[in-house]
Amino acid sequence: MENSETPNYPEGRDLLKGKAVVITAAAGSGIGFATAKRCAEEGARVLLSDTHENRLAESVSSLQSEQFEVYGIPCDVTKENEVQELLNFAISKFKTVDVMINNAGLGGQSNLIDMSDEEWEKVLDVTLNGTMRCTRAALRHMIPLKRGVIVNNASVVGWRAQKGQCHYAAAKAGVMALTRCSAMEAADAGVRVNAVAPSFASHPFLEKVSDPLLLEELEAQEPFGRGAQPWEIANIIVFLASDLSGYMTGECVSASSQHP
């Protein structure tokens, strides 16, 4: 199948019209930025966060040039105080947070016998603990209001074994469990928590941290013979963030034919 980079979704649907959306790891050209753009196209007011301040500023400027209401603030999800500052900033701009999209994650390639404690802990602190911190902060705001949506970025490796991915797979499996359990805790308040699990999405971060031979192998496993484009994952996130998925909570949507 042709690897088209041109989105073919209908525009102007306003699925998130007026919603206040916060997205972590949203700078650059990956899933986070694609999600920010799609949310803005659907009428949302969007706050981007990232640890890369220059890329963040460029991403915000790019979206603002299209007349979207977009802001940016640096945030390291491994630091609880910065996560709280992120929520506080969003509330100062939007008066509320309707949707929290937890996209921050960290991977790598290392067999367990060669992995240091530091490598293991770094991946889990960003990918799992960071998602927990953002989910917790968002729920503390949303539950009293009895409304809100959280969407987490998981991965099919949370279901499926893969060599060299013990740390990342454990973290993403944890994100899935966190999604299910927090969804149960928040359901009485009408707050929904779901996740998307991409299989293989082509973006610069993955290309930077992965073995090229592994990427070729992963691409060959895909039924379409290619990785997903970031906007293709972003469309699923928009669906989960919108009222179209209003009766879904605690679910992890596989963006692949390979589950599990």
Language-model segments: residues:
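Short C-terminal tail/terminal secondary-structure segment
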Residues: 3-13, 30, 160, 220, ...
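Canonical Rossmann dinucleotide-binding motif of NAD(H)/NADP(H)-dependent dehydrogenases/reductases
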Residues: 13-47
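Catalytic Tyr-X3-Lys loop
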Residues: 106, 113-132, 147, 151, ...
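Active-site loop immediately N-terminal to the catalytic Tyr-X3-Lys motif
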Residues: 110-113, 160-166, 188-189, 225, ...
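Substrate-binding pocket helix/loop in short-chain dehydrogenase/reductase
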Residues: 111-112, 119-124, 206, 214, ...
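Active-site helix of classical SDR
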Residues: 135, 171, 179
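Residue(s) in the substrate-gating loop at a strand-loop-helix junction
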Residues: 155
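Short, small/polar-rich loop/turn modules that mediate ligand/substrate recognition or access, typified
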Residues: 187, 192, 248-250
